[in-house]
Curated annotation (Swiss-Prot):
The keyword Transferase does not apply. This is CRISPR-associated endoribonuclease Cas2 2. The keyword Lipid metabolism does not apply. Homodimer, forms a heterotetramer with a Cas1 homodimer. It comes from Saccharolobus solfataricus (strain ATCC 35092 / DSM 1617 / JCM 11322 / P2) (Sulfolobus solfataricus). Its cofactor is Mg(2+). It comes from the Archaea. Keywords: Antiviral defense, Endonuclease, Hydrolase, Magnesium, Metal-binding, Nuclease. InterPro entries: CRISPR_associated_Cas2, Virulence_VapD/CRISPR_Cas2. CRISPR (clustered regularly interspaced short palindromic repeat), is an adaptive immune system that provides protection against mobile genetic elements (viruses, transposable elements and conjugative plasmids). CRISPR clusters contain sequences complementary to antecedent mobile elements and target invading nucleic acids. CRISPR clusters are transcribed and processed into CRISPR RNA (crRNA). Functions as a ssRNA-specific endoribonuclease. Involved in the integration of spacer DNA into the CRISPR cassette. The lineage of its organism: Archaea, Thermoproteota, Thermoprotei, Sulfolobales, Sulfolobaceae. One of its GO terms (biological process) is defense response to virus. Belongs to the CRISPR-associated endoribonuclease Cas2 protein family.
Length: 88
């Protein structure tokens, strides 16, 4: 399943922990607070469980958006400059 995960997490430590877990689950960072990837249904369940453990639902928000492959292929990407600056 193709997923887009977008988040706004206020705490630096939690935000870094979330990003590291998204990478471990096989997602790729495409923006500072956005990841995408193809993962199976079990990993989606793992993703939801991990997100619930990390974020504070009173102050943070995470969108997990399933995408059809045709939608993803029709995406428009403008620019790439500066991406490597914050990818560590």
């Amino acid at each position: 399943m193709k997923l887009l995960v977008v988040y706004d997490v206020s705490d630096d430590s939690k935000r870094n922990k979330l990003a590291n877990n998204l990478k471990k689950l096989g997602l790729e960072r495409i923006q500072r607070s956005a990841f995408e990837g193809d993962i199976d249904s079990q990993r989606v369940k793992d993703l939801v469980r991990v997100v619930k453990l990390i974020v504070d639902t009173n102050t943070d928000i995470v969108h997990i958006i399933p995408l059809g492959i045709r939608d993803w292929e029709r995406r428009i990407v403008i620019g790439r400059e500066g991406l490597e600056e914050w990818l560590v």
